[in-house]
Amino acid sequence: MTFGTAGRLPPAPNPGAPAAATWQRDDWLTLADRMLAAARPFASPGHALVTFPGPEGGYGRAVDGLEGFARTFLLAGFRIAGAQGMGVDELVDRYAAGIAAGTDPSSPDRWVRLGEHPQAKVEAASIALVLDLTRPWIWDRLPSAVRERVVDYLRPAVGDDTYPRINWVWFRLVVQTFLRSVGGPHSLDEMNEDLTTHDGFVRGDGWMSDGPDRAYDHYVGWALHLYPTLWARMAGAADLAEQRRERDLAGLDRFLSDAVALVGADGSPLIQGRSLTYRFAAAAPFWVGAIAGVPSVSLGRLRGAATRIVRHFVANGALDKRGLLTLGWHGPWPRLAQSYSGPGSPYWASKGLLGIALPADHPVWTIPEEPLPVEERDTLRAIPAPGWLVSGTRADGIVRVVNHGTDHAVEGATVSDSPLYARLGYSTATTPVLDDSGWASPLDQSVTLVDEAGRVTHRAGMRLLTVHVDTDGVGVAGSRALAHWVDPDPGQRDHGGGRAGRSRPAGHLTVYSLVRGPWELRLTRVDGLADGVEAAALRLRIGGWAVAGDATATAGGGVAVVAGADLTSRLESVHGGGTAGVTAVPHGGPLAGGLVVPWLDHPVRPGAWVATFTELSRTPVATAGRACQAVVDEDGRGLHLAVDWPDGISTSTRLDAEHARPTQVSW
């Protein structure tokens, strides 16, 4: 694999402030060297296993050690390749020794084999990728007996049809591509099958879903766009890659136009989706764009996005005093882990340092960094594939996503809501509630029905109705859900999605969002209730943004406000009525401190629209009585909404009858 050319850590920014300082290549190398040096004491005597401290992962210590080796090998490989093998002898020797020991079945350091545990298939792909990337300095210098053992270790990937049909198809493909390049066993039929499966993930505008579910998350960037670009440069991929290079480049280019608008001015990625403990792996797609040479996003902006993301985590304590990554977001927060996570899992973050594989004279290092879109102006865009409205505000640097199409499920599913996917809103400044209550009883950024026993409905399986930006500069999105109660089956493994179980319908809910800047006007209607479900026994609950840290809260008169040190969440009934409240969740998410969530309860009146105003801002504009004024008229053509926003701007929005009409309730 080759990429052609075309010390110190700078001061960190204040939280929420635009990250104006830049990093030079030496700063990136200093960080990489620091991380690699910190990992070294946790290597086994033969260097084949890197077992970081902490509780044993969900798959056992042997897998933990392999994962620690493979994921730090990614970082070491980028470092070696970028240095062209010069001045990195210790890294070359350390990881070459680990490969020799790990592939030796008689070694106490031996790796878990691909047939012994599925996780070995994931880590084998990283090993194969880096062996290709560093071929002149590691592979070509390995003794022939060790090379034969490597081939033997990777061989089980050929003919194995148990790889899940998600991003894992790239693990089989990368391994077989490397084997092909060294004269090892491989199957062109299987390689083409994996490429075809990947193409089936494509949903439009450069977006892909990680499998058949509506699983839109950071894997789009750090896996589904990263692997095609790196794979195409592997020695064994040339003929297969050539026929798809232009198409893959176009998809990456289009995706990155959206991706740069999803990063907050402080460098925080969106706190949404599974595997968040991989942290600054979210920077990887921007380096991929630089490697591929995308035409629409400049190298300066790509590098600037990557810098802001990685620096955000460095500045906020992602590396502990030993220089190690732990399970968490900023600092440690073990509950962020999925069932597949172990102490070495966070080192998938190594992908965020992919740029150091590019040589010092690559243009990405020689031109100035450029600001993010949200640092230059307010932004508003609709992304149809995930059903997202994206609103970034320059005044406070926050990027918000209003979500009507992503749930890690399929339309019509009746699983529970995953708080990582199915909430109505995510942002770069907030976390969803992720404790047990967040999985069992959706509250933050949710619209639910609550029965007399306090049981809360879920909306997963909803139908996306529309997502667009209209001519008034208002983002419009809507969805319709069969609200349902779920009793989850016991013993399920956490892979980030909702829980399966016995479900019972409550009724159909339609929700529309009108979005401008930090504000959302949320329209909600109960279209009808299921047989045996009585309106009098229910409450319609509307939840707002959760605020982390020391927060003060007020609730009353149809208004709930939560104010933290530098963030305010406001929820207000537009037409009056409703009971306002707040709920504190002491250990609800990975940001510092507990969470406080504002909410409004309304009586259930099927067929009637309920209008709610929400605001999330570091510089709040709305005040009591001046939050938002809206007139909602319904006629045979649909809904017409005349809205006076807190900044004095008036807009007019129409929702057509096909979107706005009540559902025909059937169960």
Regions found by a protein language model. Give the residues of each.
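Short, solvent-exposed secondary-structure capping/transition elements
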Residues: A81-G85, W139-D140, D361-H362, G532-A535
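Structural signal for hydrophobic packing residues in well-ordered secondary-structure cores
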Residues: A43, A76, T103, R135, ...
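Low-complexity, Ser/Thr/Pro/Gly-enriched N-terminal "stalk/linker" regions
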Residues: T2-E67, D93-G98
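Composition- and surface-driven signal marking solvent-exposed, interaction-prone regions
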Residues: Q243, R274, S298-A305, H362-E369, ...
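Extended repeat-based interaction scaffolds and adjacent low-complexity, acidic/S/T/P-biased segments
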Residues: V433, G438-W667
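Aromatic-lined, polymer-binding surfaces characteristic
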Residues: A62-L66, A70-I80, V88, V92-W287
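Carbohydrate-active enzyme catalytic cores, enriched for enzymes
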Residues: S106-W111, G264-I271, L276-E411
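Low-complexity, glycine/alanine/valine/leucine- and proline-rich hydrophobic stretches
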Residues: P373-V374, D378-H468, L482
